[in-house]
Swiss-Prot record:
EC top class named in words: lyase
GO cellular component, one term: glycosome
Record family assignment: Belongs to the class I fructose-bisphosphate aldolase family.
Protein name, per record: Fructose-bisphosphate aldolase, glycosomal
Pathway(s) the chain acts in: Carbohydrate degradation; glycolysis; D-glyceraldehyde 3-phosphate and glycerone phosphate from D-glucose: step 4/4
Gene3D superfamilies, alphabetized: Aldolase class I
Reactions this protein catalyses: beta-D-fructose 1,6-bisphosphate = D-glyceraldehyde 3-phosphate + dihydroxyacetone phosphate
Length: 372
């Protein structure tokens, strides 16, 4: 082979499947995380996000109060029948349950997969349109991922956001974020962590559902292309996308069957069947709407080769934190509220949710420009 041909070959994308000693474990973990009737609890709120939630119940934002808040749900008896995995914040990985075990150790003993948010938050993307953001955290990533694996975590999550402005997002943010998500995914798999890839087309804006569908399809297809280029092990990877809905400031409301059709149709156009599961974010939907939409998707008469389940934060926790109120006397009421929401979403994952069995109120949990 001539040197010229050799040089040209080195410039071609490899498209080779990643070689990792953890492949079998990754696939088994992803399968466990997408078990029928189960989903994920996102308990990875930052210190700043906890401050906002605690302000609503008059609770000071201390490390111990944050531990009690996480323990409210993680130590809830029987929650493992509805929750397959929990996304933890870095602080929580080191904190201890009532048994004296670290939370990852405690969760694993109960048959729940512990995970970790590994991104380092949003930063301005200078190449993009005004207000567009990238996600920091790839520097020193392998060292951090190995540390979390050693502490018992078996999956991770990384969030990139896309804000629709004037009916679109810039090509700069689409390509930059896709590359970031793909690099994060393969580095995670090299270290034994199942990557949850979260390309969130945000609910902020005045756009209609058709615009959300068009932008989501473009964003997800670029992410999939980047994952292919980097050789991700699809069977050991999960996707955490937005649902395809109208903008929160549009005055439009998508009914459950419409949201289900648009979302499943968009996924089917771009997501490989080899991916074991799609774990939706709730993105500011009310607790009830998040359950209704998921249930409709699991009853949608369109091809669905992946498990469709939940990876909710506010849509699982909001009622619980209000009933808890930061008081020991409110723990049982808070846990009942949490278990109710976990059960409703478990039923929605199975396509057996009934609105009549749920709470009467359905208040939006939308927060403009929400960060975690």
């Amino acid at each position: 082979m001539s040197k010229r041909v050799e040089v040209l070959l080195t410039q071609l994308p490899a498209y080779n499947r990643l070689k990792t000693p953890y492949e079998a474990e990754l696939i088994e973990t992803a399968k466990k995380m997408t078990a029928p009737g189960k989903g994920l609890l996102a308990a990875d709120e930052s210190t700043g996000s906890c401050s906002k939630r605690f302000a609503g119940i008059g609770l000071s934002n201390t490390a111990e109060h944050r531990r009690q808040y996480r323990a409210l749900m993680l130590e809830c008896e029987g929650f493992e029948q509805y929750i397959s995995g929990v996304i933890l914040h870095d602080e929580t990985v080191y904190q201890k349950a009532k048994t004296g075990e670290t939370f990852p150790q405690y969760l694993r003993r109960r048959g729940v997969v512990p995970g970790i948010k590994t991104d380092c938050g949003l930063e301005p993307l200078v190449e993009g349109a005004k207000g567009e953001q990238m996600t920091a955290g790839l520097d020193g990533y392998i060292k951090r991922a190995k540390k979390y694996y050693a502490m018992g975590c078996r999956f991770c999550k990384w969030r990139n956001v896309y804000k629709i402005q004037n009916g679109t997002v810039s090509e700069a943010v689409v390509r930059f974020n896709a590359e970031t998500l793909a690099r994060y995914a393969i580095l995670s798999q090299l270290c034994g962590l199942v990557p949850i890839v979260e390309p969130e087309v945000m609910i902020d804006g005045t756009h209609d559902i058709e615009t959300c569908q068009r932008v989501s399809q473009h964003v997800w297809s670029e992410v999939v292309s980047a994952l292919h280029r980097h050789g991700v092990v699809w069977e050991g990877c999960l996707l955490k996308p937005n649902m395809v809905v109208p903008g929160a400031e549009s005055g439009l409301k998508g009914h459950a069957e419409q949201v289900a059709e648009y979302t499943v149709k968009t996924l089917a156009r771009v997501i490989p069947p080899a991916l074991p599961g799609v774990t939706f974010l709730s993105g500011g939907l009310s607790e009830v709407m998040a359950s209704e939409y998921l249930n409709a998707m699991n009853n949608c008469p369109l091809p669905r080769p992946w498990k469709l389940t939940f990876s909710y934060a506010r849509a699982l926790q909001s009622s619980a934190i209000k009933r808890w109120g930061g008081k020991e006397s409110g723990v049982e009421a808070g846990r009942r509220a949490f278990m109710h929401r976990a059960k409703m979403n478990s039923l929605a994952q199975l396509g057996k949710y009934n609105r009549a069995d749920d709470d009467k109120d359905s208040q939006s949990l939308y927060v403009a420009g929400n960060t975690y």
